[in-house]
């Protein structure tokens, strides 16, 4: 009887360890997903920054392409913020999961601002592009200030 209890106990322990490992892998994948999206978005956003600051010559088609890429990428990271992914190799604060409505509002605002940036880029008007860029950057910074570890 005692042997059966040990075997059953070991089986339960092994299955819970397997479930825990699967959850850890899911969490790791979520973190990798959002980090990759933010990294690529940052690359294109930096190119736009160089243009609006005059460190890179204005090239209308490239600005349009970069702005559209940022717009597309702005929709990708959010599915990587799954419960449990506040642990691990991440700069995300736990507040994201306690203030989900605020986080969702800022993520939606970023998507809106990047969409506007892409539209304004098509005008070719550098002054308007710079303003739209600054509004987008301010939205990024607001979210980082509240929800990103330093």
Where are these regions (language model features)?
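Cleavable N-terminal signal peptides
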Residues: 9-10, 20
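N-terminal signal peptide c-region/cleavage motif recognized by signal peptidases
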Residues: 16-17
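Bacterial N-terminal signal peptides that target proteins for export
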Residues: 1-8
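Sequence context surrounding c-type heme c attachment/ligation sites in exported
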Residues: 28-60, 64-150
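Active-site-proximal loop/hinge segments that shape catalytic or ion-binding/gating pockets
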Residues: 13
């Amino acid at each position: 009887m005692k042997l059966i209890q040990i075997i059953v106990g070991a089986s339960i322990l092994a299955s819970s360890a397997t479930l825990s490992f699967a959850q850890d892998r899911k969490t790791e994948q979520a973190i990798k997903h959002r980090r990759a999206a933010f990294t690529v978005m940052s690359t294109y956003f930096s190119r736009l920054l160089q243009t609006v600051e005059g460190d890179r010559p204005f090239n209308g088609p490239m600005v349009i392409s970069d702005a559209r890429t940022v717009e597309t990428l702005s929709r990708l990271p959010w599915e990587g913020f799954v419960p449990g992914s506040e642990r691990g190799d991440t700069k995300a604060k736990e507040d994201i999961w306690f203030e989900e409505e605020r986080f969702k509002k800022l993520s939606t605002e970023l998507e809106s601002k990047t969409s506007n940036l892409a539209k304004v880029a098509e005008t070719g008007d550098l002054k308007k592009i710079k303003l739209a860029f600054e509004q987008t950057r301010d939205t990024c910074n607001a979210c980082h200030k509240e929800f990103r570890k330093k």
